[in-house]
């Protein structure tokens, strides 16, 4: 998981120290979401008639990865099944995560390979926490087909200007978007930060804006599924045995 991205000594990612030092699900940096984005209905996936409990956003950041290679501008890590993953996700797979830094752009590429003998169902997303002076100072430049606070049911058309505001009585602020065009941008009038998130629109079809508890961050997240997608036919990715697929996106400090 990426934990820092700086330019001229200025930090653009947000790190929650207590959370990062604990064994809890990471809620800072740039978590990897696999094999699900969000929390499925009743907190379970159904495979072959059996219900498997799964964490919010899956397990990719709850288990150790192995460093495959590293140099001054890139690092590559791998993850294969273990006892924990088999308990919640009864499939064979290989994940390869490559981080590459070029100037003011960090490129993140996740390759998912099906190493088993049956179809591999999953969704993928990323959850970057960008440092923010406060939510009211952050403006977004995002072109999307739909935008709502709930992924279920008919989705309303997105407004010309998408905003993220705190709902009275709620600790969370969220926008769920489909048909999102690349890139998405945010600018913070308080800190002067400007960030662009670019991605392959055929791979990352959805996106999420999220903020919680008036903390000093805002999330602008590329996803290709929703919370219950892995349980819904036609709403998740399936790789046949021997197949692989790359999910690449980038963050640029502007």
What are the roles of these predicted feature ranges?
Residues 1-31, 35-37, 42-44, 51-54, ...:
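Beta-strand-rich N-terminal accessory domains
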Residues 4-6, 118-124:
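Short, hydrophobic/aromatic beta-strand segments
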Residues 50-103:
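Extended, loop-rich substrate-binding clefts of extracytoplasmic carbohydrate-active enzymes
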Residues 52, 57-69, 166-235, 241:
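Acidic/His-leaning functional-site neighborhoods
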Residues 90-94, 101-107, 117-121, 215, ...:
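Coil-to-beta-strand transition motifs
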Residues 101, 112-114, 251:
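Hydrophobic beta-strand positions in extracellular immunoglobulin-like domains
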Residues 110-116, 211:
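Asparagine-centered strand-capping/turn motif at beta-strand->loop junctions
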Residues 119-121, 128-202:
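Active-site/ligand-binding surface loops and adjacent short beta/alpha elements
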């Amino acid at each position: 998981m990426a934990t820092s991205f700086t330019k001229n000594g200025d930090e653009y990612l947000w790190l929650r120290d207590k959370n990062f030092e604990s064994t809890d699900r990471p809620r800072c940096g740039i978590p990897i979401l696999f094999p699900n984005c969000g929390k499925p209905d009743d907190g379970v996936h159904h495979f072959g008639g059996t219900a498997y409990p799964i964490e919010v956003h899956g397990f990719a950041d709850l288990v150790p990865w192995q460093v495959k290679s590293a140099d001054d501008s890139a690092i590559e890590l791998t993850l294969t099944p273990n006892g924990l993953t088999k308990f919640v996700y009864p499939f064979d797979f290989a994940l390869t995560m490559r981080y590459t830094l070029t100037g003011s752009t960090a490129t993140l590429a996740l390759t998912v390979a099906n190493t088993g003998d049956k179809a591999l169902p999953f969704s993928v997303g990323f959850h970057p926490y960008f440092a923010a002076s406060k939510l009211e100072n952050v403006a977004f430049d995002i072109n999307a087909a739909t935008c709502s606070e709930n992924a279920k049911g008919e989705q309303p058309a997105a407004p010309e200007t998408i905003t993220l505001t705190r709902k009275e009585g709620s600790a969370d602020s969220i926008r769920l978007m489909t048909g999102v065009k690349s890139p998405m941008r945010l600018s913070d009038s308080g800190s002067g930060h400007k960030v662009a998130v670019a991605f392959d629109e055929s791979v990352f079809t959805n996106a999420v804006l999220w903020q919680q508890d008036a903390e000093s961050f805002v999330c602008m997240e590329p996803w290709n599924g929703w919370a219950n997608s892995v349980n819904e036919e036609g709403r998740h990715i399936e790789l046949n045995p021997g197949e692989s697929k790359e999910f690449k996106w980038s963050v640029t400090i502007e």
